[in-house]
């Protein structure tokens, strides 16, 4: 599939869900999957200029898909563990635009983790939660429901799922040029990046195989490049307190990785120190 070169491209899942939405929906509440979900309308003024859009495009183009990392993790021979995933019932706790967007990204990765491990029931459960969260952000749900139904019918066929995602990717192109939703997309992407690294570090911390550890350490070391791009993107939202606080934590993680000049210098102690910071941040985001 030409458009998906890194397995389940994060842009497909994230941006397709968002791009299908419009600004016409003003209902105070919407019903989704038999649950009444408050629609969050963020009224804080955000100025989004061409530079911000460029940084978003640049970050998306220069940060490997977090889902690609999950796909790589599935090839390391580490047993699937859905106890690490964010509880789908917790979506009701997320009552701000920021928390919903961040956790939409987190749920995207959890869904993808189940998908690359061929765990159909988990895929369906997380896909439904992704739909609820995207709907609660005021995004149009009709396409999501159509995709979800088709995905449910093809849970055992990874290629078919990828084709579905590839199809809706086409519809997300225009979204990248839509000023009003760049902030939301930035938060969704950040949530996905954090969750991907969280799962990688959690699972790598359980292995004793030296070759697998080396891969995990190299992966974490590589993040110093990508994390810099991500923090520069989030720097654009200085008028958003929650985003500033998140970015401060990301910068602390970057400051621990950046001085390490070679992946071979990443030992158990350093890996644990950085992993613990990632775990602490992730705990704040999903509470």
What are these regions (language model features)?
Residues 92, 96-99, 111-118, 122, ...:
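Non-transmembrane, amphipathic alpha-helical segments
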Residues 16-19:
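C-terminal motif of bacterial Sec signal peptides marking the signal peptidase cleavage site
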Residues 30-147:
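N-terminal Sec/ER secretory leader and immediately downstream segment
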Residues 155-237:
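Extended amphipathic alpha-helical interaction segments
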Residues 111-118, 137, 141, 176-179, ...:
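Secondary-structure edge/capping motif, primarily at the C-terminal ends of alpha-helices
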Residues 231-287:
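A cross-kingdom marker for long, charged
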Residues 21-24:
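Bacterial signal peptide processing site
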């Amino acid at each position: 599939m030409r458009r998906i070169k890194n397995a389940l491209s994060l842009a497909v899942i994230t941006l397709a869900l968002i791009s299908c939405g419009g600004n016409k929906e003003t209902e105070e509440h919407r019903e989704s999957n038999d649950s009444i979900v408050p629609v969050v309308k963020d009224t804080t003024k955000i100025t989004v200029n061409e530079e911000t859009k460029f940084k978003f495009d640049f970050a998306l183009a220069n940060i490997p898909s977090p889902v690609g990392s999950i796909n790589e993790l599935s090839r390391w021979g580490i047993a699937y563990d859905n106890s690490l995933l964010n509880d789908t019932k917790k979506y009701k706790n997320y009552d701000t635009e920021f928390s919903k967007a961040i956790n939409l990204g987190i749920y995207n990765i959890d869904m993808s983790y189940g998908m690359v491990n061929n765990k159909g029931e988990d895929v369906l459960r997380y896909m439904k939660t992704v739909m609820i969260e995207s709907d609660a952000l005021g995004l149009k749900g009709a396409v999501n429901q159509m995709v979800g139904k088709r995905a449910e019918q093809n849970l055992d066929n990874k290629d078919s799922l990828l084709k579905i995602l590839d199809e809706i990717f086409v519809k997300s192109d225009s979204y990248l040029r839509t000023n009003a939703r760049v902030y939301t997309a930035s938060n969704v992407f950040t949530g996905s990046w954090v969750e991907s690294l969280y799962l990688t570090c959690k699972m790598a911390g359980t292995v004793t195989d030296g070759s697998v550890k080396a891969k995990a350490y190299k992966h974490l070391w590589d993040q110093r490049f990508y994390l810099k791009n991500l923090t520069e993107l989030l720097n654009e939202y200085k008028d958003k307190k929650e985003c500033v606080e998140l970015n401060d934590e990301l910068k602390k993680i970057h400051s621990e990785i950046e001085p390490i000049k070679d992946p071979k210098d990443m030992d158990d102690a350093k890996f644990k120190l950085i992993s613990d910071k990632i775990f602490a941040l992730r705990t704040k985001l999903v509470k």
